[in-house]
């Protein structure tokens, strides 16, 4: 079970998520990264990846983590929402 940022980063590496989906890093923000009670895990994806891969990534994460996962693509994010996310984002890196 993933309970904090460090265990989430270890999970991503173990599952080879970065290589499987062509990502160099994944931003984690929101209540999960702040260590508060969380209902879902909010992720910021900076690279452009095909829509089907994005769906596959979300489905895999939700199945494995047993939590809803919200993915925000930086390129398409509303500026106000992105600015808020960037205030507490932590990056899990390959």
Located regions from the model:
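Catalytic core of pol beta-like nucleotidyltransferases
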Residues: 1-27, 33-38, 46-94
């Amino acid at each position: 079970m993933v309970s904090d940022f460090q265990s989430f980063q270890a999970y991503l590496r173990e599952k080879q998520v970065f290589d499987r989906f062509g990502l160099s890093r994944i931003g984690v923000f929101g209540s999960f990264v702040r260590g508060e009670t969380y209902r879902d895990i909010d992720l910021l994806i900076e690279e452009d990846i095909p829509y089907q891969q994005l769906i596959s990534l979300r489905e895999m994460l939700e199945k494995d983590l047993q939590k809803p996962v919200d993915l925000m693509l930086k390129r398409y994010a509303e500026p106000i929402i992105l600015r808020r996310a960037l205030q507490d984002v932590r990056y899990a890196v390959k």
